[in-house]
């Protein structure tokens, strides 16, 4: 599908969703599609305060469905806050989504051309002359950001923030975390999933959003003396889970500082002990982190499920041919045996499926 075809499809869906939209509402949609929210961000503190104030003043909460724009951004309704997402987290995502789009003007012009062709073919409720007059005025003002029309506001009561689509797959996870932290004051999260599914990237984002402590399962590889045939015959035996349990999870459960040793793959030995004082949120990320021997120590768990073709593409892009071969012939088969043998996916609280740009969620009670 070409970008023009995608724009046509998205505009068709947008007009069907909002039959009362006026030319300026169409312009706003296209502007946000091309430029995102770069023009709106002043400071993180102000962004959070505005979200809180607007949410509290809303008379109609509406639905919580995220609305895709025609590009790398989407509209997240403020009503989503009632599902547990905090104004602070949404404000953080909003600010992190604000960036300069150097190709924004060019993209906007291309989208406007598609929109005009659709107007001429009668795809919108307003006339082509109304569209052309509004477009001429908008162009004269330098294609500045516009507000929704009064007609649109009366009909639909819009209240949302524009954020990057890259954050959308993780909104249910953020909402669960925000609820947990509000209720308990602290939480331990397991990020489980296959190779190249984005666990480390997500843990870095969580660290930036929540200032959390992150422990990596890769630091608990088996030591050479543990790599026996009997050990590898165990389902999920490819992790020193005993050490992860004794050095990290049990101290966390007791509210104590964690002193542990990272396994150095190059030296094939444990490094010197380090002591970490956990924050309110602690994340354990990596395959095997939700092993049945460990799962009871978590407050929340998420499984990142990656499409096999996309997984292969990512691994080939990130690694040397020799290392990629080890992934395909050694580590991924072991992960699959573990996933199937322990039914980890079904035992996690949240499943986030990732297949290229296609994301979906399976919420669990």
Predicted regions: what is each one?
Residues 155-182:
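N-terminal pre-Walker A segment at the start of P-loop NTPase domains
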Residues 1-153:
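Long, basic/Gly/Ser/Thr-rich N-terminal segments
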Residues 210-216, 222-275, 281:
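Conserved nucleotide-sensing/catalytic segment adjacent to the nucleotide-binding pocket
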């Amino acid at each position: 599908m070409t970008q023009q075809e995608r724009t046509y499809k998205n505009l068709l869906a947008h007009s069907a969703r909002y039959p009362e939209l006026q030319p300026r509402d169409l312009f706003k949609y296209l502007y946000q599609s091309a430029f995102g929210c770069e023009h709106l961000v002043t400071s993180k503190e102000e962004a959070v305060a505005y979200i809180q104030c607007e949410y509290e003043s809303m008379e109609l909460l509406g639905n919580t469905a995220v609305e895709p724009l025609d590009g790398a951004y989407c509209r997240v309704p403020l009503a989503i806050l009632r599902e547990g997402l905090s104004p602070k987290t949404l404000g953080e995502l909003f600010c992190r989504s604000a960036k300069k789009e150097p190709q924004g003007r060019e993209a906007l012009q291309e989208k406007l051309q598609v929109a005009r062709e659709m107007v001429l073919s009668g795809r919108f409720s307003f006339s082509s002359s109304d569209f052309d007059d509004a477009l001429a005025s908008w162009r004269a003002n330098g294609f500045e950001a516009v507000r929704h029309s009064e007609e649109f506001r009366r009909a639909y009561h819009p209240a949302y923030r524009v954020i990057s689509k890259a954050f959308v797959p993780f909104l249910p996870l953020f909402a669960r975390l925000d609820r947990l932290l509000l209720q308990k004051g602290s939480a331990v999260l397991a990020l489980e999933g296959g190779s190249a599914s984005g666990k480390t990237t997500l843990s870095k984002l969580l660290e930036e959003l929540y200032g959390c402590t992150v422990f990596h399962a890769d630091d608990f590889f088996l030591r050479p003396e543990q790599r026996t045939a009997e050990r590898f015959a165990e389902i999920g035996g490819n992790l020193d889970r005993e050490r992860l349990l004794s050095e990290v999870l049990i101290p966390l459960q007791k509210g104590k500082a964690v002193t542990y040793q990272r396994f150095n793959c190059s030296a094939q030995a444990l490094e010197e002990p380090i002591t970490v004082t956990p924050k309110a949120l602690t994340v354990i990320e990596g395959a095997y982190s939700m092993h049945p021997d460990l799962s009871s120590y978590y407050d929340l768990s998420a499984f990142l499920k990656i499409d096999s073709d996309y997984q292969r593409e990512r691994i080939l892009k990130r690694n040397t041919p020799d290392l990629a071969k080890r992934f395909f012939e050694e580590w991924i088969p072991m992960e699959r045996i573990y996933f199937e043998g322990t039914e980890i996916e079904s035992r996690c609280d949240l499943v986030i499926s990732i297949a290229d740009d296609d994301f979906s969620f399976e919420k669990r009670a």
